[in-house]
Design a protein with these regions (language model features):
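N-terminal secretory targeting modules
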Residues: 1-72, 100, 131, 234, ...
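Serine-esterase "nucleophile elbow" of acetyl-processing enzymes
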Residues: 53-114, 124-132
Length: 271
């Protein structure tokens, strides 16, 4: 509580204090108009920058959605299409079939090489990965078997290839291979067991036998009884590949669409 007598006993002090207050107030500068302009300009710059960032996000999301989905067909002559026209091998037929089914934004890259062994395939992975595949269909090992290469070596190479592809963001579909029993039943069984074992251990989708429905049928293979005809490749595409591949394409396209939608939604800018 304030003592009123003490307050009245000090009029000069109060008057002096009021005088000082008036003098100080009179000496204060008016707000600088340049400072206000600078503040307005800063706010405007921040707003423009935020709008630019939002536009860039929308552009990047649109480009991602429009960028083709890349499927890499990686393997040996069975992939390359030895002995058939360029539009008859399985990668070409697969892309054409996908287009017919409405997947207009999907491209299939043929990276098959005749005579390729699992070791050779591993050695060219750096070059192959430049395609940045979203999905890779990997079929290799037949030439290793023809040469009688140790099963452990073949499996190690396939595991290396799968891991490299996965590390680079590609989902792998592994095409299983089976061989004739002229190499001995032990080798044949050990070789066939590679593919399901790798698929299970490395969490990849397996086509149990890539040539299922075609291998061993003279009507669907060329004179060498090894490489499919155009008709044989058609069966491989429609029956062996598409049932496994289509759900993966659908999932990837949905993910791209969701990413684009989220990125194109404007965020609130605080000014």
């Amino acid at each position: 509580m304030i003592n009123i007598s003490s307050y009245l006993a000090k009029p000069l002090i109060i008057a002096a204090a009021l005088s000082v207050t008036l003098v100080v107030s009179g000496c204060q500068k008016e707000p600088d108009s340049n400072t206000a302009d600078d503040s307005t300009q800063t706010t405007s710059t921040q707003s423009t920058s935020a709008q630019t960032n939002e536009t860039q996000k929308v552009t990047e999301a649109t480009e991602q959605q429009q960028a083709p989905l890349t499927i890499l067909a990686l393997g040996d002559s069975l992939t390359e299409g030895l002995g058939v026209d360029n539009d008859a091998n399985y990668p070409a037929q697969l892309e054409a079939r996908l287009q017919e089914l409405g997947y207009k934004n999907v491209k299939v890259v043929n990276s098959g090489l005749s005579g390729e062994t699992s070791t050779g395939l591993v050695n060219r992975l750096d070059w192959v990965l430049q395609t940045k595949p979203d999905i890779t269909i990997l079929t290799v090992g037949a030439n290793d078997a023809i040469r009688g290469i140790d099963v452990a070596t073949v499996e190690a190479n396939i595991r290396t290839a799968v891991k490299r592809l996965q590390d680079n963001g590609s989902e792998v579909i592994l095409g299983g291979m089976q061989i004739y029993d002229n190499l001995g039943s032990d080798y044949v069984e050990s070789f066939a067991a590679i593919y399901p074992r790798v698929a299970k251990d490395m969490n990849v989708t397996l086509i149990p036998f890539f040539l299922d429905g075609v291998g061993g049928d003279p009507k669907l293979n060329q004179a060498d009884a090894i490489h499919p005809t155009k008709e044989g490749y058609t069966i491989i595409v429609n029956d062996n590949i598409l049932p496994i591949l289509q759900p993966k394409i659908e999932k990837l396209e949905a993910n791209h669409a969701n990413t684009a939608t989220k990125s194109s939604t404007p965020t609130e800018t605080t000014q």
